[in-house]
A protein has these predicted regions:
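Short N-terminal "domain-start" leader segments
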Residues: 1-21, 71-93
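A short, exposed loop/beta-hairpin motif centered on an aromatic-Gly-Thr core
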Residues: 25-44
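Generic N-terminal leader/processing signal
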Residues: 2, 7, 39-41, 55-58
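Amphipathic alpha-helical interaction segments
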Residues: 19, 28, 47-48
Length: 94
């Protein structure tokens, strides 16, 4: 069973097993959550999603997580373009 340990705006972070789950509460859980290994990474992704930031140091996994979390189509498209430009494009589940 997971336990909510942090919330900022519509994003909740839950402790789950040996990792963390970030959920955009404005989306269905199936389509609006992602898993991360540490709390620091979870908070960074939440802040980036809220501010709609894109960092050059983001990994493919981080970009895919932000794509799943965001409701903002313009931000989602920028993230997808970053994946394509970086040559790290893969199947995206949005």
């Amino acid at each position: 069973m997971s336990r909510k340990i942090f919330q900022r705006k519509e994003y909740s972070i839950y402790r789950a097993g040996d990792g963390f789950i970030i959920h955009n509460t404005n989306k269905k859980f199936e389509n609006g959550h992602t898993h991360v290994n540490n709390f620091y990474k979870a908070k960074i992704l939440v802040i980036m999603a809220i501010k709609r930031e894109i960092d050059d140091k983001l990994s493919k996994r981080d970009i895919e997580s932000l794509i799943r979390l965001t409701n903002d189509n313009r931000y989602r498209n920028k993230l997808i373009n970053k994946l394509e430009r970086s040559g790290i494009n893969g199947e995206i589940d949005s």
